[in-house]
């Protein structure tokens, strides 16, 4: 799969830009702040319905504009599709496929798949659990686009349950009427159902990703492993991949009952996939706090390379996006990463200077300056 044309209107710094793209390597080169990352950010948005740089859509719309439009032509084998996303901050986004009638934005998921390497990836190893949960959930959705709906349902149910708990906490503090626990029981069941599905998908992903990540780490840093991926669940007990969804549902709902008193006191849901973490081990020790800066980079690269290999093996090779990542790496890791990604069907690279792009990544070049994109 590869993107053959990218069109942006009022996206970030671009009033309008048209960029034809080829298979193989394409590098966007220009000083920082000129708009090169905006191009690959748009491609990534098509794959995830989100940005790797900001948490909301508002910053993606050019100042003074009401909306932004991302349009891309995509080819997979003999099939070509045109995707369009309209970003409307404060209102519902819109989507179209092949100029058809409007579809839900999440209906475009799976048409474009990407694996993004960026300076922010270091947070996968050194950052908070939320960074690793996002990594897992975006990869889950790339494998199975229907999981976007499950994730959305989980967030909706969690929000409703937290609202109920906050009301109960307020009433308790002010001597009001105690809450009808049967209402909370209903929300426990809803959270347990969608939470068990999300948990099952995460566990399956980690079991599949583990050997790929270990191999990838060895490719990036020969002799530096092994690495180990372990899921730490707030539910407690055994939540291994052999557990059925029904068993996970029973564990999750039982855990909710077990902490109900504390939840009512604090007004927040204390167990569930939103409280879980992916533990990253390196040579039998936790990578967070133990791995050196270079080892942390090798680990982050290994997770992305393993993601790429997983998606590629499942039949729809993703676009590889390397956003200013080479400037963050030492010479050895830079060359190893370049050698590992160059066989990709489509590789998009951004760099401040041409010298940051390893020689093995020869291909099309675009100069990016002051919002202008010109092939060189």
Swiss-Prot record:
Q: Mind telling me which InterPro entries this protein's record contains?
A: DNA-binding_RecF, DNA-binding_RecF_CS, P-loop_NTPase, RecF/RecN/SMC_N, RecF_2
Q: What would you give as a GO molecular function for this chain, any one?
A: single-stranded DNA binding
Q: Which Pfam families does the annotation name? A: SMC_N (PF02463)
Q: Where are the transmembrane segments?
A: none
Please provide one cellular component term from the Gene Ontology annotations of this protein.
cytoplasm
Please, one GO biological process term?
double-strand break repair
What does the protein in this record do? The RecF protein is involved in DNA metabolism; it is required for DNA replication and normal SOS inducibility. RecF binds preferentially to single-stranded, linear DNA. It also seems to bind ATP.
Q: Which PANTHER family match?
A: DNA REPLICATION AND REPAIR PROTEIN RECF (PTHR32182:SF0)
Q: Which family does it belong to?
A: Belongs to the RecF family.
> In its UniProt entry, what is this protein called?
DNA replication and repair protein RecF
Organism encoding this protein:
Streptomyces griseus subsp. griseus (strain JCM 4626 / CBS 651.72 / NBRC 13350 / KCC S-0626 / ISP 5235)
